[in-house]
UniProtKB/Swiss-Prot annotation:
Gene behind the chain: pyrH
PANTHER family, sorted: URIDYLATE KINASE (PTHR42833), URIDYLATE KINASE PUMPKIN, CHLOROPLASTIC (PTHR42833:SF4)
Similarity annotation: Belongs to the UMP kinase family.
Top EC category: transferase
GO terms under cellular component: cytosol
HAMAP family cross-referenced by the UniProt entry: PyrH_B
Protein name: Uridylate kinase
UniProt source species: Helicobacter pylori (strain J99 / ATCC 700824) (Campylobacter pylori J99)
GO biological process, one term: UDP biosynthetic process
Self-association state and partner proteins as the record states: Homohexamer.
Length: 240
């Protein structure tokens, strides 16, 4: 992959399901530790890092509302709280290995974390702290992909990284189809109109309107995040 990326501030987004590891629910401590060490390698190379984590390892708002008992709005708020749980867990993992970390929530939970204030978030980043953004956008009906894109734009990230279990963007699910073809680069429009799953349309449209590159890469390959960001190498795909 030859696409050039030169940046100092990034936002890394990964799913809550990734935290569960091979389990279907909860947080795998080994996965948490691996991610923390990958983030540390970025900080040690003078990269300012913001993080958004999904909450699907605990609850998903859409799924919670399917039974008809829990309304979608309430289900989404439950999902936001799940992301705060994951954010606090990641904060603990990062601080355990020596990284100064702050959690900022879009919903006020002052006993646990700071409320989201973008100027304060930027100041934390400038001081070398990792900032984890919890509770999505603070509004129902918006995904954590959209929240991640929004936060990336607000804090002036050079790109948003969607860290996954695969090596990039494929024309179909590589876990199901052996003939899946990896796409190194993709336009915003192609990502919007095609059947290729990158992010939801709202997130991609936000990125397009603000010329924010989207990078999809494998977070489970040791050192890959740093290779992608710092050295313009590694295995990844880009939407731009």
């Amino acid at each position: 992959m030859q696409a050039k990326i030169k940046n100092k501030r990034v936002l890394v987004k990964f799913s809550g399901e990734a935290l569960a590891g091979d389990n279907q629910f909860g947080i795998d401590i080994h996965v948490l530790d691996h991610i923390a060490k990958e983030i540390r390698s970025l900080v040690e190379n003078d990269i300012e890092v913001g993080i958004v984590i999904g909450g699907g390892n605990i609850i998903r708002g859409v799924s919670a509302a399917q039974g008809g008992i829990i309304r979608r709005t309430s289900g989404d708020y439950m999902g936001m709280l799940a992301t705060v749980i994951n954010a606090v867990a990641m904060q603990e993992a990062l601080e355990h290995i020596g990284l100064d970390t702050r959690v900022q929530s879009a919903i006020e939970i002052k006993e646990i974390c700071e409320s989201y204030i973008y100027r304060k978030a930027i100041r934390h980043l400038e001081k070398g702290r990792v900032v984890i953004f919890g509770a999505g956008t603070g509004n129902p009906f918006f995904t954590t992909d959209t929240a991640a894109t929004l936060r990336a734009i607000e804090i002036g990230s050079d790109l948003i990284i969607k860290a996954t279990k695969v090596d990039g963007i494929y024309d179909k699910d590589p876990n199901k189809f052996k003939d899946a073809k990896k796409l190194d680069t993709l336009s915003y429009n192609d990502a919007l109109i095609g059947d290729i799953e990158v992010m939801d349309d709202t997130a991609i449209s936000l990125a397009k309107d603000n010329k924010l590159p989207i990078v999809v890469c494998n977070m489970f390959k040791k050192g890959n995040l740093l290779q992608v960001i710092k050295h313009q190498q590694g295995v990844f795909s880009m939407v731009k």
